Amino acid sequence: MKDKLEALLDQALSELAQASTEEGVQELRVKYLGKKGELTSVMKGLGALTPEERPIIGQVVNTVKGKLEEGFELRGGEIREAVKSARLSAERIDVTLPGRRRPLGSKHPITLVTEEIASIFGALGFAVAEGPEIELDFYNFEALNLPKDHPARDMQDTFYFGESVLLRTHTSPVQIRTMLKQPPPVRIIAPGTVYRCDSDATHSPMFHQVEGLMVDKGITFGDLKGILTLFISQLFGSDIGVRLRPSFFPFTEPSAEVDIACVICRGKGCRVCKETGWLEILGAGMVDPEVYRHVGYDSELYTGFAFGMGIERIAMLKYGIADMRLLFENDLRFLKQF
């Protein structure tokens, strides 16, 4: 029986050496050490041996079993290590290869235009001022020469929270807050979000404006025209035509609408400019003395001008965008063009 056990060990180790998968090793383990395995069958015959043979053969059986279990563990480990090495080799990273760049986004056209406007006026000495979007009636209307029941309030469809609290309809309240906080000279622009009850292809209930204010001794309408002409030439090009037309705003006197030569036809007349050759881009004027009264400035000593423009309109003209709603739809196919 000893010879039979040694032959069984040699055969098992030989087959084990040929196994190439963990499943194959497991099958051999069952074949030799399972409940119906070959070594188990031999062990069942120990009872037929003489008392003298039984301990000797039992020791041989234990030795064979121990070597088989050790062999199965070793071969299984070798196979697992080989599989791991093969997988690591297949997944090897060549550190000399160029990396993959993460896709980068781009700035929204509204942001681009706002930053460009701020940069142009910043070079002219204007600081950026900010204020709350939820405003009081005083800052949004009354201090801007728009008392209650003034007919000019109908020019702006306003979102009200109550009698005196509202969503600001322009960024002019920032000018009032700034003048109340500091004495002249003042030179600021106020970019920000504003709200009005209006929505179509060229209007949105939420949009963006940049308004500007300059107050000091000796400021004239000529200063207003010079600064706005310089601003327009830097934004749209030095060859663009500029004109000022008389207009009305409750908080400036005199007031003007500022037009530029149509960016599509260059002043020749087309569908975009309604054959006039001109496009309105902003409103401006000399600050009304009544506004100075509300903020405590001496209108006999100081003069100044204010202006305001819609950023969406500037963006539409600058980038040739036909429908304002494209600026708010978050369509990446559109936004990636900027």
From Swiss-Prot:
Top enzyme category: ligase
Gene3D superfamilies named in the record: Bira Bifunctional Protein, Domain 2 (3.30.930.10)
Catalytic activity: tRNA(Phe) + L-phenylalanine + ATP = L-phenylalanyl-tRNA(Phe) + AMP + diphosphate + H(+)
The protein's required cofactors: Mg(2+)
EC number: 6.1.1.20
Compartments, record wording: Cytoplasm
Protein's GO biological process: phenylalanyl-tRNA aminoacylation
Key word Manganese present: no
The UniProt record lists the keyword Aminoacyl-tRNA synthetase: yes
Gene Ontology annotations for the cellular component aspect, listed alphabetically: cytoplasm
Subunit structure: Tetramer of two alpha and two beta subunits.
NCBIfam families: pheS
Name used for this protein in its record: Phenylalanine--tRNA ligase alpha subunit
Annotated source species: Geobacter sp. (strain M21)
Gene: pheS
